[in-house]
A protein has these predicted regions:
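Signature for phosphate-centric chemistry
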Residues: 33-158, 162-333, 337-432
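Residue-level micro-sites within transmembrane alpha helices that shape
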Residues: 13-14, 27, 76
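Bacterial N-terminal signal peptides
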Residues: 17-28
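Bacterial N-terminal signal peptides that target proteins for export
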Residues: 6-18
Length: 432
């Protein structure tokens, strides 16, 4: 007679455990628990693989007499397929185990799902997805609607791009949507190795391989300390006869799980996260976020190197803004590149939030990648001028108004261009 009561208690405990996990994910990833959608909360564990989140636009009115006249922009490519060998390595490991009869029933289901992902990546490694194209079209429309004084009449837009296909296709979608909003505009396009180096700007492109090795050693040690991979491997593999690098497998399959949100249009409903426990998602998500922050952002341990690599990009913002201030025909400068170009720039400028300097092991909480470097992340410097010719600038990062550490606003979020220009010029001199 007591059995139903016991079963009810067990079910209640399970429900409470799931509810507690949802709250813990929200806290661990720095999320204000405003969105009860479990899918969104879990997808934020994807770090820089997280797709862009569009939120309400909120603009603080400029000081009296000032109107926007020019936008200087940097946009990361939109949602994409995985780069590297994550998918291929995961598929090979599972196929080998299947051949040897070493997959559990859950492992067999995982293999079926990974085959679908591998098919979506065939001859398309790293390429933009439909969701990524949609992100850039929507971002362009929102920018044009937000600053109608800039995007009117017959003016000129200058576009620079890194050389990878996903970046070029992102640029195409953005500029086509912007052309629809401003049909009288003309667009100039340029790309090449010169622009790839400037727009990508990471430390690994500057011959400092020893720093990259130190970052890898530090993040690998963090992974070994924080990821308990044994339960996952035991659920997928039925015996140890097929050799498996358990930690690598856990990290690879988590990257595969993370990219599924970017393929939502191509693989609707496919969910690899279901093969993980809540604790595994938390640990693997933290590790991924810390790895990406250490690689590209303003970490206490390694940040000086990637920030130094963004000085040429900062100089480009400075010089092109000076040209636009002197030439009313220039409406915007658009740049399209990668996370490794944008995140260091945020640190160099001193943006509160994306440019914060914290120990890399705390970055999953204190500077979360899902918030500051999702797919299609963007920076917009919006320039304002009054009748007297005074120039102010405000910075939008992922369409949010930003504070610049160490500069006095007049008032916030508006800053004197002369003050920001002096900072950018000073940083350029430091690198010489």
């Amino acid at each position: 007679m007591k059995m139903p009561s016991i079963v009810m208690r067990i079910k209640t405990i399970k429900r409470l455990a799931i509810a507690w996990w949802l709250v813990s994910v929200a806290v661990n990833f720095g999320i204000a628990f405003e969105q009860p959608d479990r899918v969104l909360e879990v997808e934020r564990s994807a770090s820089v693989y997280h797709s862009y989140e569009f939120s309400e636009i909120d603009d603080t009115p400029p000081p009296k007499g000032f109107k926007p006249f020019y936008v200087s922009h940097y946009g990361r490519h939109g949602s994409r397929r995985l780069t590297g060998t994550f998918v291929a390595d995961t598929l090979a490991t599972l196929e080998n185990a299947q051949k040897n009869g070493d997959l559990t029933e859950e492992g067999k289901r995982l293999l079926i799902d990974v085959r679908k992902i591998a098919e979506a990546h065939e001859d398309m490694i790293g390429q933009l997805t439909e969701r990524g194209a949609q992100e850039h079209r929507r971002l362009a429309r929102r920018m044009a609607a937000r600053f109608p004084d800039v995007f009117k009449d017959a003016r000129r837009v200058r576009c620079q791009s890194a050389i990878f296909h996903r970046v070029l296709i992102s640029q195409a979608n953005f500029t086509m949507a912007l052309k629809d909003a401003a049909p009288a505009f003309t667009f100039d396009f340029i790309t090449g190795d010169k622009y790839q180096k400037m727009l990508n700007g990471p430390h690994w492109a500057r011959g400092t391989a020893n720093v990259a090795e130190k970052i890898k050693a530090a993040t690998d040690a963090y992974a070994k300390e924080n990821i308990d991979h044994a339960p996952l491997v035991e659920r997928i593999f039925s015996s140890a006869s097929s050799p498996v690098d358990a930690l690598k497998f856990a990290r690879d399959i988590f990257a595969v799980a993370s990219i599924c949100q970017c393929l939502r249009c191509e693989l609707a409903g496919l969910d690899i996260y279901r093969y993980f426990t809540a604790e595994e998602i938390d640990a693997l998500g933290r590790t991924l976020a810390c790895e990406h922050y250490a690689d590209m952002a303003n970490s206490v341990e390694f940040g000086d190197v990637p920030l130094d690599g963004s000085r040429k990009l900062a100089r480009d913002f400075l010089e092109r803004a000076d040209e636009a201030i002197a030439d009313d025909g220039i409406a915007a400068d658009l740049r399209f590149g990668h996370d490794s170009g944008l995140w260091p720039l945020a640190g160099l400028i001193g943006l509160e939030g994306p440019g914060d300097r914290v120990p890399f092991a705390d970055s999953w909480r204190d500077c979360p990648a899902w918030k500051w470097m999702p797919m299609a992340s963007n920076l917009q410097m919006v320039f304002y001028r009054n009748a007297a010719g005074e120039v102010l600038v405000k910075i939008l990062y992922n369409e949010r108004e930003m504070r610049i550490r160490g500069l006095e606003p007049v008032p916030w979020p508006y800053y004197r261009w002369a003050d920001l220009r002096a900072r950018l010029l000073g940083d350029e001199k430091k690198s010489n």
